[in-house]
Amino acid sequence: MNNLIMLVTNAVTLSEAAGGLFDFNATLPLQALQFILLTVLLTFIFYKPIGKLLEERETFISNNLAEASAKLLKADELCEQYETQLKEAKTGAQDVIAKAESEAKGIVAQEITQARADAASLIAQTNKELEAQKKLALQQLETQIDELSQLIKEKLLGKVVL
């Protein structure tokens, strides 16, 4: 272990003595080349697939948003159409109800007029019958009065003549 520590301290002292922290020898261009290769490899292996996935996701989201917007517009149109149809149906129903009410009122008025006419006719007929019965009763009474007065005369005259 002591040997390892010694080696590290010797390497540090040698690097400080040779050029300091940045040595411009063959390792610097090699490290730059490694960095460029790592960047290229990461670009092809990691960044491009992730970029492609992100692009696909963005396309998917934008397509879904466009589709949802189209469906929302269609739903709004259908809603307006159904509301219009509902208003028309309500108006039609109100017209039918108003027409039925007016027909019913007309029928009721006609029936009332007919009933009044029938009642007036019945009253007139009853009055005629009562008048006819009254005349008949008066004639019968007159006949009976005449008969009774004749009887009274005969009795009175018959007693007076005796």
Curated annotation (Swiss-Prot):
The chain crosses the membrane at residues 26-46. The keyword Transmembrane applies. Keywords: ATP synthesis, CF(0), Chloroplast, Hydrogen ion transport, Ion transport, Membrane, Plastid, Thylakoid, Transmembrane, Transmembrane helix, Transport. GO terms for cellular component: chloroplast thylakoid membrane; proton-transporting ATP synthase complex. Pfam families: ATP-synt_B (PF00430). It is found in: Plastid, Chloroplast thylakoid membrane. It is a single-pass membrane protein. Its main location: plastid. SUPFAM superfamilies: F1F0 ATP synthase subunit B, membrane domain. In plastids the F-type ATPase is also known as CF(1)CF(0). Belongs to the ATPase B chain family. F(1)F(0) ATP synthase produces ATP from ADP in the presence of a proton or sodium gradient. F-type ATPases consist of two structural domains, F(1) containing the extramembraneous catalytic core and F(0) containing the membrane proton channel, linked together by a central stalk and a peripheral stalk. During catalysis, ATP synthesis in the catalytic domain of F(1) is coupled via a rotary mechanism of the central stalk subunits to proton translocation. F-type ATPases have 2 components, F(1) - the catalytic core - and F(0) - the membrane proton channel. F(1) has five subunits: alpha(3), beta(3), gamma(1), delta(1), epsilon(1). F(0) has four main subunits: a(1), b(1), b'(1) and c(10-14). The alpha and beta chains form an alternating ring which encloses part of the gamma chain. F(1) is attached to F(0) by a central stalk formed by the gamma and epsilon chains, while a peripheral stalk is formed by the delta, b and b' chains. This is ATP synthase subunit b', chloroplastic. It comes from Emiliania huxleyi. The lineage of its organism: Eukaryota, Haptista, Haptophyta, Prymnesiophyceae, Isochrysidales.
